A protein has these predicted regions:
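N-terminal Rossmann-like NAD(P)+-binding domain of SDR-like oxidoreductases, especially those catalyzing
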Residues: 1-176
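Short, flexible, glycine-rich and Lys/Arg-enriched loop motifs at helix boundaries
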Residues: 41, 171-192, 202-223
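Short capping/connector residues at structural and topological boundaries
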Residues: 41, 49, 86, 90, ...
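Glycosyltransferase donor-binding loop in the core domain
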Residues: 55, 76-79, 91, 188, ...
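Short-chain dehydrogenase/reductase
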Residues: 92, 140-148, 182, 186-194, ...
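C-terminal substrate-binding subdomain of Rossmann-fold SDR/epimerase-dehydratase oxidoreductases
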Residues: 195-331
Length: 331
């Protein structure tokens, strides 16, 4: 599909920018639609960047009218379980309503191929491990519910007007581009690995451990971490697989779980620096254990994670952090 024109919403964000780079390397003509509220123009070198919000249907329609996109990769949205518990309406507006706006414009312009960012949070507190795509969704946070509503919308659009889609259910994205030119830069930061690395680098006084009484071997939550470059490769595979009217749901993970305390110890080993931690109460909406089966991505998309050692994932994140201690704009 070299030369195919693609729209990537939220393409200046963490996972989006890594995917944009890979798609461009593969010959796709990539246009980015991003309001830059959390994304960074520097991450995409400002190339073919439309600064706009999905809620602005006029700007969105004009982009489709002018560029004649063949497919869309949809990253735009907000993604914090904790914040969604405090501000649920933000999540229904930014995730659900804005995806609705995108789908309306896609339908109007007869664009029937979509790869969308979903989330492991749709599963809630799983009743089986590893989690399969057929596991019953039961989200426990507004963020997870917003992602499940989006999946329902996609299924209805597939039935009504032939939308073809792949919904990629990420587990915990981590790491950075191996060459250190792209990485994680959130304000405020909420992800475990960059927070731990900031403590190691002396940029934060301590790391909060939210919940140490979970039913896990060391009492801390267990998560399945997947490298951001592997996520980008999965989006490429999904884009090349998708056909109008077809639907696919895929977990993206490594299939191995790591506890919060294990992650902190690995960060200390990678950096050679101590990380002070303070135990805090559990956060609402945090399941104790999330580990995935990735058989669907493997058998249907031909995707395998290349980064299966969490230490190696953390090493790429540390390389980014050392070369960009204050992110893109202030390194």
């Amino acid at each position: 599909m070299s030369g195919t024109r693609i729209l990537v919403t939220g393409g200046a964000g963490y996972i989006g920018s890594h995917t944009v780079r890979l798609l461009r390397e593969q010959g796709y003509d990539v246009w980015i639609y991003d309001n830059l509220s959390v994304g960074h123009a520097e991450a995409v070198a400002g190339r073919q960047l439309i600064v706009g919000d999905l809620a602005d249907r006029t700007t969105l329609h004009a982009a489709f009218e002018q560029q004649q996109f063949a497919a869309v990769v949809h990253f735009a949205g907000v993604a914090s379980v904790g914040e969604s518990m405090r501000e649920p309406l933000i999540y229904y507006r930014q995730n659900v309503a804005n995806t609705l706006a995108l789908l309306e414009v896609m339908a109007r312009h007869q664009v029937r191929k979509l790869v969308v960012s979903s989330s492991c949070t749709i599963y809630g507190i799983p009743t089986e491990t590893p989690i399969l795509e057929t596991s019953v969704p039961n989200p426990v946070s507004p963020y997870g519910r917003s992602k499940l509503i989006i999946e329902w919308m996609l299924e209805d659009c597939a039935a009504a007007w032939g939308l073809g889609f792949v919904a990629l259910r990420y587990f915990n994205a981590a790491g950075a581009q191996r060459d250190g030119t792209l990485g994680e830069d959130h304000t405020p930061e909420s992800h475990l690995i960059p927070l731990a690395l900031q403590v190691a680098a002396g940029q934060r006084p301590h790391l909060d451990l939210f919940g140490t009484d979970y039913p896990t071997p060391d009492g801390s939550c267990i998560r399945d971490y997947v490298h951001v470059e592997d996520l980008a490769r999965a989006h490429l595979a999904a884009l090349e697989h998708i056909q109008p009217g077809e639907k696919l749901f895929c977990n993206l993970a490594t299939g191995r779980g790591w506890s919060v305390k294990e992650v902190v110890r690995l960060c200390e080993q990678v950096t050679g620096l101590g990380i002070r931690t303070i135990e805090q109460p559990r956060r609402p909406g945090d399941p104790p254990h999330l580990v995935a089966a990735v058989n669907t991505a493997r058998t249907v998309l031909g995707w395998e994670p290349r980064y299966v050692d969490l230490r190696e994932i953390i090493e790429t994140a540390w390389h980014w952090h050392r070369t960009h201690p204050r992110g893109y704009s202030h390194s």
